[in-house]
Amino acid sequence: HVLVAGETGSGKSVILRCLLWQMIEQGARVYMIDFKGGVEFGKQYEQYGEVITERERALQVLDLLVKENEYRLHVFRDLEVKNLDEYNKKTRQNLCRIGVFTDELAEMLDKKGVAKEEKQIYEQIEGKLSTLARLSRATGINLFMGVQRPDANVLTGQIKNNIPVRISGRFADKTASEIVLGNTDAVNLPDIKGRFLYKVGNETIEFQSFYFDDETMLHEVCVDQGEMLTEAPVYKVPEHKIPVRKNENKKAEVVRSGRKEKKVTAVKTSGEEKNSYEDPFVGMNSREIEEEMRRMDEEDLNLNFGDF
């Protein structure tokens, strides 16, 4: 997980987009949460991932990702692997990373001035983010969060304490620097756009961030051995496979019907239904999933993940 903090004009959004493009180039699935109506992640980003502008949809996606994280943890335990890299090496399944990007965390979590009846959804979003921050690093579901005015109302302890990588631009306020870095070093940064401090563990490094414009990167991002990406699927759900546990106590049954709807039901030995959900990709390898998603490009997939 990564936290990027900086005042207006510091270059915070550019760093986040740089990280976003790196994730895209490495084959990750990305979600971009932008409650400014898509100003930071405009229409050109929609071909690479879902741009979320509504709070209700953000909560829905975060809930799906929490369930996906539970699924991955379940599979990792069964296979006795510790993280996504070990899983992919052991199974050769190439389970993809998932990145959740938000340019301004305060828009999601700051409840100041919010009507009492609206606070519930803020608290639900905060709860989902806290769960992912605590549990999803090893499973390859990564949070990339930007914040302009860090304070305790936005960066709660549950979230902040589980973000190992912190990047901060210059702050005039010592308190803001303390919240992000745990020290006041950001106050002494030169007032140069793109100048940041990078902290991992106890080490803090000053650096000048890379600058690029969106138009350049849109032309640079390529797929399939250099072929330019002109049309790409809008990924709206995480890629996953169904865990099948082979032991004396549990069995699993897979029932497939149709190309776009496949019913998957896990059952106990007694035949009692444990959970079920719709998954159009069960049984496919990563290449088949990619081809299927291209055929289903721009269709609104609304899949429910079982709770393992």
Regions found by a protein language model. Name each.
Residues 84-85, 285:
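Flexible coil/linker segments and helix-coil junctions enriched in charged and small residues
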Residues 51, 139, 145-233, 237, ...:
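Conserved ATP-driven motor cores of ASCE-family P-loop NTPases powering translocation/secretion/packaging/pilus
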Residues 87-89:
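Short, charged, amphipathic alpha-helical segments
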Residues 1-82, 92-181, 186-190, 259, ...:
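P-loop NTPase catalytic phosphate-binding loop
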